[in-house]
Amino acid sequence: ADSLTQFDGIKGRYSHEAFYEEKACDSCHLNK
């Protein structure tokens, strides 16, 4: 959750969505 929050704050919501779409699986595992 922290990583996603920081990424969203730095890159912006649009970039966050693109990042999540590309690495949704990795994000879920890393953040959970």
UniProtKB/Swiss-Prot annotation:
It is found in: Periplasm. GO terms for molecular function: metal ion binding. One of its GO terms (cellular component) is periplasmic space. Its main location: periplasm. It comes from the Bacteria. Heme binds at residues 16, 25, 28-29. Disulfide bonds: none annotated. The keyword Metal-binding applies. Monomer. Participates in sulfate respiration coupled with phosphorylation by transferring electrons from the enzyme dehydrogenase to ferredoxin. This is Cytochrome c3, 10 kDa. The lineage of its organism: Bacteria, Pseudomonadati, Thermodesulfobacteriota, Desulfuromonadia, Desulfuromonadales.
